[in-house]
Amino acid sequence: MAQVFLGMSGGVDSSAAAVLLQAQGYAVSGLHLSLLSGLPLPADRLPDDGSDARAVASLLGLPFYDMDLSPEFRATVIDYFIREYEAGHTPNPCVFCNRRIKFGAMWDAARKLGADYLATGHYAKIRQDPATGRHLLCRGADRSKDQSYFLCRLTQEQLSRTLFPLGDLEKPAVRALAEAHGLINAQKRDSQDICFVPDGDYVSFITRCVGHESPTGPFVDREGRVLGQHKGFIRYTKGQHKGLDLAIEPPLYVLRKDPADHAVYLGHNEDLFTSELIAGDWNWISIPALTAPMTVTVKTRYSQREAEAVAEPLSGGQVRLRFREPQRAVTPGQFVVLYDGDAVVGDGVILE
C-alpha cells in the first residue's frame, strides 16, 4: 500500500483531502508544518491551526506529525520577501514557499518517514502527457479556487510524486464531504492573507524583522519634478493610488521605484498600461524550454483575468510577452504564468 503524507494546515481542504485519499486506498499520514516560530509576530496574531489538524487526524485514525520548519522558512521565504521589497519589487511569497518549503523541505521530511507521495489540499490537477511523458500542472475544476498560479514553480520531480485529491471538486462539494464525515472544520473560514502577515500590515512586519524604518525619499513625476516626500520605500507598489497623500488632480499612481535613491515615480492611470513585458528565471512545465514563439494565455498576478499573448524566446533564457491588449500595472518581482488551455506551460519572474 502506497504511503502518502498529507500536508494538513488545519483547514477544511486538507482535511477533506485526507478523507478522499483514505477512500482511494492509500495509507495516509498527516503532517502539519509550524513555520512561524521566532518571527516578530504579536502572540494574538499567531495562527493555531495545528490543533484542528491534529483533531481531524485523530478522528480519521491517521498517524500525525507536527514538524517545525521555522528556521528554513525564515532563511528562504522571509528573507526573500524582505529582500524583494527592499529592492523595489513586489514579491509573491506563497509561490516561493510552495517550491522551497511545502514541496521541498516538507517532502524531504516526509521521505525520511517513508513517504511514497506527498499530497496537499490545493485546487489543481496533475496529469502526465502521454506523448512527452512530462508531468503537467493543470487548473482545478473549481475555477474560482484554482491554485495552479501558486504552484507554478514546481519542478518535474516534485510533480511526479505529488497528489492533489481536490482537483476535480468544487468548494461546496469539499465542505459537504467534510460535513458528512463529521470534521470539526467543515465550515471553517478560508485563510485569505499571507500566513506571516495575518493582518495584512507587511510594512510593520518588515520593520520589526530588520529593526528599522524603511528609508524615505522623493515622489517624482515623469518629468523629474519632485512632488513631495514619501513615508517609506517599501510602502508602495506599482499601480497604487491610495496612501500617497498628494492633493493633485488628476490622481497619480505609482509607476516604478528606484532603490538607488529610494525614489517613487508617479504618473497617471493611462501610464500604467503596457503591451509587453520581459521575464527571466523561467520554470518550464509542459515543455522543456521555449524555442519558438508560442501563443498562450497569461496571468501576471493571481487575481488577474487571463490575457492572450505571444511568448518569444530571447537570449539568456529570458522571454518577451507581447499582449493582444495592453495590461495594467505589470509589476517587477511578480510571477507571470503561461497557460496552454488548462495546462501551465511555465512561469518566470517579471523583470520589466
What is the role of each PLM region?
Residues 119-126, 130-352:
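AMP-forming adenylation/ATP pyrophosphatase catalytic core
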Residues 1-152, 163, 172-173, 179:
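ATP-dependent adenylation/nucleotidyltransferase module used to activate substrates
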